[in-house]
């Protein structure tokens, strides 16, 4: 049986974030649990033009075995401003972070034009976060993925010179 491959590695400077420290509600499995959710954006090139977003849904302070969760600590340091970002502190003062993640789908129904449609947005989902002293010298190794997939359909798009689209 073939093992499914779904790994991404994002390595670069912390660009910005929208992380929040939250607490689970009274109807959750573990009420009152503090957790972090939101997005972290990483600039993977020296020119700060290739920004990759990683989404965290639910990161708690401890792992399922009760040990301290290192990723929670890194994300908490980002929230607390202990780790600088390009937007807040400039590129030279931004933390260098590596995130080992996976590609996931954020599927939901949306009411568009009076008709409910399934929306499937692809995103980097969570993963281990580690603070480093410097990013990989080779920019091509900073944003990598290793996935297997099945292509279920394709479509031909006609060339459009106005939009600079080849056939």
Question: What is each residue range found by the language model?
Answer:
Residues 1-167:
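OB-fold and OB-like single-stranded nucleic-acid-recognition modules
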